[in-house]
Amino acid sequence: MANIDYSFENSIPIGPLKIAALDSCKDFAKKVDDYIVSFRQHDAEALAQRQSMLDFRGYDSKSYLLDFSCPRFGSGEAKCVLKESVRGSDIFAMVDVTNYSLTYQLCGEVNHMSPDNHYQDLKRLIGSCRGARRVNVVMPFCMRAVSISVPEENLLTVHWH
């Protein structure tokens, strides 16, 4: 990736960054995480001056990947289990709903995950991140975007990328 000459002298992070990569997007999320870690290490001078500021807690990290899992039960149902706190964090949930290569067991049979299975796991993750400051979704294929019709006065701050 290209080097970008950018410093954070005039900006403050929203909250500690966490990348929540669902199984369908783990490889890509790892590349994003590696890039952000190296990018932020180059900003060490600005960070050293601000380490005592509360806004910069968690800014310098060896990895921003969130530790969580979405285990499935024998019935095919699943749940999201967070293994670390997300309170006050800026979460970026990454999912590839068109990744058909993932499988799960249902009544002893192997099933491939459909776009809807991936989407349901994403909803489980979002539901478990209630204490986060902000949740952003990085989803290359937004299957329900055209069917959502929300009156303007009811709009929420949800970032779909």
Q: Model-found features: residue ranges?
A:
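PRPP-associated nucleotide enzymes
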Residues: 1-161
